[in-house]
Amino acid sequence: MSQLIPKLARASVVDSITVVTVTAEQIREADQAYALRDEILEILNQSNPSCLVLDLGKLNFVGSIGFLAFLGVRRHLAGGRIVICNMSGPVHDMFAVCQLISPDPAKKAPFEAAKTLDSAIARLKS
């Protein structure tokens, strides 16, 4: 019998930009990663945004399997921009090591990074 996974994300709109806040503290297991991906994709299917902010302020650990969730979202929003904000040090380091974000704006990466939600919104509005 599979275990029920609590809701892992919630959506809001800030300045006409869809913001998905990941409510999980850790993403370690495949079923949790797939559930998170599916929740975010459902949000995207309902709002059909051209850009997205992922707020990872509550997330303090993401295992390698967790990146499947974020890459699935990236693939779904292929032509749009995704800015990740409020990353803890270890989460930021994992995204950087995996080259999913880049400290060099001239170097393309699948995701953009911002320190705060406000700076993520500002980045997408510029």
What are these regions (language model features)?
Residues 23, 88, 115-118:
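Residues at the C-termini of beta-strands that transition into short coil/loop
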